[in-house]
């Protein structure tokens, strides 16, 4: 069982996933910092509140933390946009690889010469 687990962990997909999760966690910290220390103060210039996490409204005893939700939405949009750019870049590289692998179209003159050659071979028989 230990051998099977070692084989499972050693597969490329599992290792890629582990690296992705670790980098994703670090990237989330960067995005949180970007939103909290750069984007929110910039938006705060227009709204009047620099820290959106304190933005709340109350109805009766219920407290709605709209600011925390806005922070989460901004984080999500930034992460989604970066992932979109990464996928777009990867797809572009993959398309270029496929173009390089595709055989070059035959030269029309070469095709005519091959037909002539084949016809001459038939005549010799």
Swiss-Prot record:
Its main location: membrane. It is a multi-pass membrane protein. One of its GO terms (molecular function) is mechanosensitive monoatomic ion channel activity. It is found in: Cell membrane. It comes from the Bacteria. Keywords: Cell membrane, Ion channel, Ion transport, Membrane, Transmembrane, Transmembrane helix, Transport. Pfam families: MscL (PF01741). One of its GO terms (cellular component) is plasma membrane. Channel that opens in response to stretch forces in the membrane lipid bilayer. May participate in the regulation of osmotic pressure changes within the cell. Belongs to the MscL family. Homopentamer. This is Large-conductance mechanosensitive channel. It comes from Ligilactobacillus salivarius (strain UCC118) (Lactobacillus salivarius). The lineage of its organism: Bacteria, Bacillati, Bacillota, Bacilli, Lactobacillales.
């Amino acid at each position: 069982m230990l051998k099977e687990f070692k084989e499972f962990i050693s597969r490329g997909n599992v290792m890629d996933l582990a690296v992705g999760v670790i980098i994703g966690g670090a990237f989330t910290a960067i995005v949180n910092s970007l939103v909290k220390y750069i984007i929110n103060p910039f938006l705060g210039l227009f709204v009047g509140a620099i820290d959106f996490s304190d933005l709340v409204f109350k109805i009766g005893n219920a407290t709605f933390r709209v600011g925390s939700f806005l922070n989460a939405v901004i984080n999500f949009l930034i992460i989604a946009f970066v992932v979109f750019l990464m996928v777009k870049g990867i797809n572009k590289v993959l398309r270029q690889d496929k173009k390089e692998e595709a055989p070059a179209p035959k030269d029309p003159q070469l095709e005519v010469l091959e037909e002539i050659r084949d016809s001459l071979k038939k005549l010799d028989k």
